[in-house]
Amino acid sequence: MFENYLCINGKKTKLTDEQMRQLGITPVESEIAKMSRLSKAGEAADNYNVHDTIVVDGITFEIVGIGHDIDASTGRNNTVTLRQVDHIKKSRINPGSCPDGFAASALDNSLMKSPQNWIPESILPYVRNVVKQYVTYDGSIKVMYRKLWVFSESEMFGSAIYAPAEDGKRYEAFATRKDRIVCGENGSACFWLRSAAVDSGAFCMIDAFGGADYNSTKHSYGVALGFCV
């Protein structure tokens, strides 16, 4: 995101967009700001397509859904969903078992409390709180409201494979194995999903080839973040 500054007596002073307009200067709109504006106006589908990408601070984000997710504050699905596809960081789900599901995990706690550690801060003002489902190891389906999350097995495949039940609908973008692949430091990376597997100490994941898998919550794998604007 471009920021507005004015140099006064050699000191750089940050200005709001409104202050810039009062000075007769038209602020530069970043791509994420434009996407947010069009999304809220219900015009995203007229301007963007699934698989379009934007780059923010050197990190690539792909549009995986338009109108897929529901804004928690309005109940409307005028959203654009993006997924981080490169420069993927690693984390474990939890230091031990996680019987109460993703919302009780250390990873989810970090995404909520320290989002600036996960995505560029310039994106954060535009990220919206949306409704997400998650399944626990015993098959219970629960609801959470989040700005940052990792995807579910059903959102990736359209059905439960290693999860005990479905938690969400498949995004249009994830039609093939290739569509699910993301990149870490050394090429294609395995990454976590928020769906529990049929054990309190295991969660679903995607392998480096875009296929379904699962592993212990204590192991460190990629965190391919999703969010909506």
Give residue ranges: language-model regions.
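Short, intrinsically disordered N-terminal pre-domain segments
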Residues: 1-17
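Collagenous Gly-X-Y triple-helix signature in extracellular proteins
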Residues: 2, 17-229
